[in-house]
Amino acid sequence: EYFAGVAKYDFGSIVKKLDDKSSFGFSFIRFGVDNIPNTTELIDAQGNINYDRITYFSAADLAFIGSYGKKVNDYLSVGGSVKIINRKAGDFAKAWGFGVDISSTYKKNDWGIAIVAKDVTSTFNVWNYELSNEMINTFNSTGNELPENGLELTLPRVILGVFKNYEFEKNVHLLIEFNSDITTDGRRNVLISGNPFSIDPHIGAEFNIRDLVFLRGGFGNIQKTPDLTGKMIYTIQPNLGLGINIKGVEIEYALTDIGDASIAEYSNIFSSTINLNPE
């Protein structure tokens, strides 16, 4: 659950090795907010408020993703994904979209660098609205602009990362990573804000004990926000995580925004992975 339970993020995937150097996967993602009150018919024809006329709907994004990855040599790996996106808000707004992501990782000794280019061709979403006569009348009477069918573009984003692995003793490791999101859609409220490029840095670490227990922590979402006096200050979002791997079954938990340090609400994230051919 994201943002103190307001939104729900569901993810599932299956991955199959094609050979010793390549694999293919299929993933499904749903991110949505459910039980949103629809008050467009709250007031009846006589001008009376009738709460029984309130209905509820969901606003959700669905993604169907096919991915392929290949190990080029002992140091370099490359991969890519094709995604089909379905977005909807109740029965009155729907969109279909298409996008492509590519990535590459280079590792040598205990160092590594990685790059992910998301929405490299820009992701296209074609919106179609089907409003009832009651909704159109409500929009007009309240001075709201009627939505129009159109095309939504998600511009490319590049994620650059560098990581270092430290080995303290046999099967005990510490991995430290620094990465940055580079967006291309104009000025954003991030640490380095510009037009058209903005840079949002993150740092994280994972303590690995015998590939059985994983302790994780990190910082990100650095933003400039007003405090109680109206003075602009920088806020940062701390996150913690725990992972357990037992005989090919991995259980992961993460808690974001520890102590409500940033302007965002906290999120609880659970995931599990089953390896059908554990080594």
Predicted regions and their residues:
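Subset of outer-membrane beta-barrel
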Residues: 1-279
